[in-house]
Amino acid sequence: MRVWIDADACPRAARDQVVKFALKRGFEVVLVAGQAVARPNFACVKLIVVPSGPDAADDHLVEHAVPGELVICSDVPLADRLVKKGVAALDPRGREFDERNMGERLAVRNLFTDLREQGQVGGGQAPYSEKDRQAFANALDRILTRLSR
């Protein structure tokens, strides 16, 4: 089994959590980034730096991840592409992307993009919290168990 991480947008605490699970359960972790990021020094962790460009890391993830694997990403359009391909997708705050919720997740993302462009809302997500880390660990455990069956 393999877990892919969109490393450009994934909080370090979530990446570290995936590595912890990988060491316990014996799977490979592949960090995909548009620029060099810190790679934990374990044999189970691989770093792929893709050429810079719009959506280069996303395209690499969609091209190489296969059903039965998991991708950690915050990007809703990327998650939609992965789910359509049959690849499991989870955001770093513990929310799984699937066929049942993709339409709603895309609509909310598009609404907030439009509101930001019109200057009606500002800022971004709240800082990554202990509650987020715990929700992520629980969801990660649940999905890995499901995928290993």
UniProtKB/Swiss-Prot annotation:
InterPro entries, alphabetically? UPF0178
- Name the domain of life: Bacteria
Q: Which residues form a coiled coil?
A: none
Q: Which cysteines are joined by disulfide bonds?
A: none
Which family is this protein grouped under? Answer: Belongs to the UPF0178 family.
| Protein name per the record | UPF0178 protein Pmen_0294
Q: Which organism is it from?
A: Ectopseudomonas mendocina (strain ymp)
